[in-house]
Amino acid sequence: NTSVLGVIPYFHLDIEDEDSLTERFRKKSRSGLAKIAVIRLPRISNFTDIAPLEAVDELDVSYVSNISQFGDPDVVIIPGSKNTISDLLWMRQNGLEGKILRHAAKGGIVFGICGGYQMLGQSISDPTGAEQKGTVRGMGLLPVTTVFEQEKRRTRVSGRFAKVGG
């Protein structure tokens, strides 16, 4: 004897998931022409930036949250973060930063999106405590420094690859 007010049907809607509330992170890897490891940051944001890559059958996109899952990817992507300094320190503490740096040293490709891009630089400073007050050393892969201010400014940036081999 259960009272039922109504039934809500399930419809698969192809709309963006909310940050971190998704089945994507449970997705099993598949065989593809290129292996892409996306770092599963604890405070990941805008992970839907990766969705176009997931839609390409020839790409094996996997989300990595520890060194045992890292494998031997062709490309590593560090996505955006809601707290860049905390997530960089998390990668440093669990060994993922070292894995990424070794991958880059072997000629592997590393991309950073938003906060991930900032992590690839020389340093990240947050003098006002916009995210987490203090200054930390970046991964040192790009000649950039980041200084957070109370008011965020978003600007488009473009660049060119100097020379890509392979």
Question: What is the meaning of each model-derived region?
Answer:
Residues K35-V38, I44-G115, M119:
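Phosphate-binding active sites in nucleotide-utilizing proteins
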Residues L21-T22, I77-P79, D126-P127:
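Short low-complexity, flexible loop/linker segments enriched in glycine and/or proline
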